[in-house]
C-alpha cells in the first residue's frame, strides 16, 4: 500500500503523495501492484502539449527515451493516458540530488568529482547517440541512486513547454549552466550545448560554486558569452585544462564528447559504464497515449479535500533510511531537515500563518485545499522563484509541512527556506528529541 488517505489508482499503479512539482507537471510516488516496484509518476496536462503544438515532438522524444537503457539515465518504464492527462512512469531514485550533496558537504574531492563527471559523460553521450539532447543539464537534474551512482533525469523531456510559452526550459530558468549560443536565442547544436553544461557542472563539483554567478543578468550574460571566469588555487591542473577546452564560447571550437573521453585527466581510473543489454521494447503504449486516449475511471487524480494522512510506510520513504529524528529536531538547519517541519496547530491555522508570512515577504500565494504555491522574484529581483507547500497529518493533531522547489535556482530556494521558516516560530513544534527517538525506534521495530 502506498500510503494513507484516499488511495488512487492509475492502471496497475497505486498512486500516493506528490514528491515534486514543476511548471507543467507533477511527480507522484506510486507503486506497481503487480511487482511491488516503487516508481515515480510524472503527471502532465494534455492541454499544455496541445496548446504549444508539440505533441509530435514530445511523442518522438518519449518513444526514444523508452528505448534508452543506460545505467546513468533515469529509466522510462511506460506511458499511460486519459483524455486530460498523460502519465509517464519513471524509475524511482532514492539518493537525492547531487546538488544537495554539494550544499551539505561542500566541494567534492578530485576522485569523486571525476567519477561523477565520467558517469555524466557516459549517460549524455549515450543519449546523444540516440538523437536526444537534454538542454537543461545542471546538478539539480543529476540524481544519485542507493549505491551512489549518478542518474540523469528529464533526458528527452526538457523541451516540453514551460510556463510563459517558452519552448526550451533552458531559456526561462536559471542561465548559469547554459551555453552562450542558447542565451543568444540563435540556432544551436544540442550536443555542444549539453557539453558546455557538463563543463560548468565539473567546475561546480570541484570548486563548490559556480564559474558564472552575478547579481544582475546583464553582467551574468556578458561573462558567459565571453567565458570570463577564474579558478580557485586548489583546482587540479588537469581539470583546468579540460574545462578551458569545454567552456569555449565559440561552439565550433568547443571540445566534443569524443575528445573529452581522450583527455588524460578524464581517463584516469575510468571504467566505462557497462551498457544494459538490449531488450525488445514495445511502443504501443506511447502511440495509444497520443493517438487515441480513452477515459478510464481509474485514471483520475483529484486533489484531496483535506490533508493527506501519512502512515509509517510514507514516513520511511521520506526519511531515506529511517532517520526520522530530523523531522523533530529544530536545532538542525532547514536544509538538513529536508525542508520539512512539524506543527500541533490546526491545519487551517497553519495554512493561514504560512500565507501571511509569504505575503509579508512580497510573494504571491495560491491556495487549493491544503496545498499552497508561493511565487515571485528572488531576493535579488533577478529571477523567478516558486515554492510548493503541503500539509500532511502524521498523527492525530500532529501535522507535517513539506516545502519543495517548483521553479527557480536551488540556492535562491535555500535562502528563501531559511528566511521563511525563521518567521514561522509560532507554528513550528519543538518536539523533545529523546522522546522522538524512542518513538521512532518502536516504529522501526514493528
Swiss-Prot record:
Its EC number is 2.7.11.1. It catalyses: L-seryl-[protein] + ATP = O-phospho-L-seryl-[protein] + ADP + H(+); L-threonyl-[protein] + ATP = O-phospho-L-threonyl-[protein] + ADP + H(+). GO terms for biological process: response to nitrate; root development; signal transduction. ATP binds at residues 19-27, 42. Disulfide bonds: none annotated. Residues 336-365 are annotated as: PPI. This is CBL-interacting protein kinase 8. The gene is CIPK8.
Amino acid at each position: 500500500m502506498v500510503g494513507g488517505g484516499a488511495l488512487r489508482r492509475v492502471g496497475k499503479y497505486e498512486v500516493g503523495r506528490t514528491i515534486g512539482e514543476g511548471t507543467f507537471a507533477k511527480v507522484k510516488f506510486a507503486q506497481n501492484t503487480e511487482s511491488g516496484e516503487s516508481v515515480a509518476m510524472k503527471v502532465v496536462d494534455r492541454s499544455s502539449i496541445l496548446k504549444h503544438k508539440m505533441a509530435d515532438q514530445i511523442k518522438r522524444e518519449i518513444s526514444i527515451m523508452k528505448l534508452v537503457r543506460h545505467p546513468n539515465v533515469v529509466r522510462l518504464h511506460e506511458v499511460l493516458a486519459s483524455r486530460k492527462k498523460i502519465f509517464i512512469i519513471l524509475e524511482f531514485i532514492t539518493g537525492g540530488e547531487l546538488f544537495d550533496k554539494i550544499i551539505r558537504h561542500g566541494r567534492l574531492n578530485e576522485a569523486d568529482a571525476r567519477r561523477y563527471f565520467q558517469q555524466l559523460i557516459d549517460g549524455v553521450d549515450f543519449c546523444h547517440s540516440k538523437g536526444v539532447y537534454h538542454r537543461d543539464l545542471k546538478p539539480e537534474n543529476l540524481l544519485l541512486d542507493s549505491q551512489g551512482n549518478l542518474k540523469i533525469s528529464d533526458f528527452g523531456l526538457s523541451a516540453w513547454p514551460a510556463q510563459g510559452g517558452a519552448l526550451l526550459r533552458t531559456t526561462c530558468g536559471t542561465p548559469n549552466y547554459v551555453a552562450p549560443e542558447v542565451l543568444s536565442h540563435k540556432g544551436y547544436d544540442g550536443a555542444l550545448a549539453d557539453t558546455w553544461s557538463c563543463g560548468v557542472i565539473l567546475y561546480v563539483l570541484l570548486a563548490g560554486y559556480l564559474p558564472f554567478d552575478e547579481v544582475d543578468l546583464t553582467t551574468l550574460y556578458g561573462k558567459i558569452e565571453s567565458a570570463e571566469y577564474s579558478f580557485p588555487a586548489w583546482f587540479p591542473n588537469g581539470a583546468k585544462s579540460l574545462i578551458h577546452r569545454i567552456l569555449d564560447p565559440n561552439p565550433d571550437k568547443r571540445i566534443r564528447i569524443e575528445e573529452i573521453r581522450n583527455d588524460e585527466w578524464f581517463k584516469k581510473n575510468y571504467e566505462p559504464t557497462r551498457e544494459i543489454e538490449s531488450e525488445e521494447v514495445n511502443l504501443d503504449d506511447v502511440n495509444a497515449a497520443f493517438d487515441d486516449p480513452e477515459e478510464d475511471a481509474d485514471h483520475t487524480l483529484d486533489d484531496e479535500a483535506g490533508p493527506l494522512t501519512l502512515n509509517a510506510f510514507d514516513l520511511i520513504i521520506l526519511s531515506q533510511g529511517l532517520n526520522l529524528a530530523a523531522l523533530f529536531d529544530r536545532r538542525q538547519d532547514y536544509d538538513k531537515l529536508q525542508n520539512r517541519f512539524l506543527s500541533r496547530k490546526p491545519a487551517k491555522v497553519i495554512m493561514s500563518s504560512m500565507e501571511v508570512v509569504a505575503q509579508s515577504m512580497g510573494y504571491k500565494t495560491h491556495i487549493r485545499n491544503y496545498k499552497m504555491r508561493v511565487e515571485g522574484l528572488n531576493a535579488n529581483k533577478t529571477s523567478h522563484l516558486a515554492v510548493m507547500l503541503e500539509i500532511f497529518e502524521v498523527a492525530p493533531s500532529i501535522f507535517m509541512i513539506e516545502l519543495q522547489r517548483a521553479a527557480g535556482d536551488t540556492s535562491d530556494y535555500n535562502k528563501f527556506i531559511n528566511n521563511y521558516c525563521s518567521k514561522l516560530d509560532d507554528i513550528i513544534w519543538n518536539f523533545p528529541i529523546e522522546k522522538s527517538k524512542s518513538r521512532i525506534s518502536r516504529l522501526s521495530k514493528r
